[in-house]
Regions:
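Membrane-helix boundary connector in multi-pass membrane proteins
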Residues: 103-121
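Core segments of alpha-helical transmembrane spans in multipass integral membrane proteins
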Residues: 30-37, 56-77, 93-103
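Cytosolic juxtamembrane helix and N-cap/initiation of the first transmembrane helix
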Residues: 1-29
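Membrane-water interface at the C-terminal end of transmembrane alpha helices
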Residues: 130-147
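Membrane-helix boundary/interface segments in integral membrane proteins
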Residues: 47, 69-86
């Protein structure tokens, strides 16, 4: 008796056929850019604390959505749904590095006032934005390979 089972290709974790990771990725990108802009505005304003608070909120939301996206990316990667090419690995590493840098950045931003942004806070924000933009840029070729 022939018991062949039809093989259905696995799909990324999705809602209504829309991959969740692709929906979540823009949130940390926008939030980390917003945090950087708030840091620069804080320094230009002479230390208006509203900009420091706004930067911290951007970092918090960016990290929350980023960690969720990172977990989904890892699951898709383990399930072999994200290409394990040089681009796929680079995307994963740049994205995780950006989250790690921004995690350190949020701890720096919890300091008091000027010292939270001037120096290491702004530097970490710049590094985090560069890393997340590279990760987002590398994502497009990785998605096209899957389709």
């Amino acid at each position: 008796m022939d018991e062949t089972v039809a093989h259905r290709p696995a799909r990324p974790i999705s809602i209504a056929r829309h991959p969740i990771y692709s929906m979540l990725l823009p949130v940390p990108v926008v939030c980390f850019i917003g945090a950087l802009l708030a840091d620069v505005t804080y320094l230009k304003s002479g230390g208006n604390l509203i900009w420091l608070a706004l930067s911290s909120w951007f970092l918090l939301f960016g990290l929350a959505f980023g960690v969720l996206a990172a977990l989904i990316l890892l699951i898709d990667f383990v399930r072999d749904l994200t290409p394990r090419t040089g681009t796929g690995w680079a995307h994963l590493l740049f994205f995780y590095a950006a989250l790690l840098v921004e995690l350190f950045s949020i701890f720096i931003h919890e300091r008091d006032g000027w010292t939270a942004v001037a120096g290491p806070g702004l530097t970490l924000s710049i590094i985090g934005v560069v890393l997340i933009l590279i990760a987002a840029w590398l994502r497009r070729p990785a998605v096209e390979v899957v389709r």
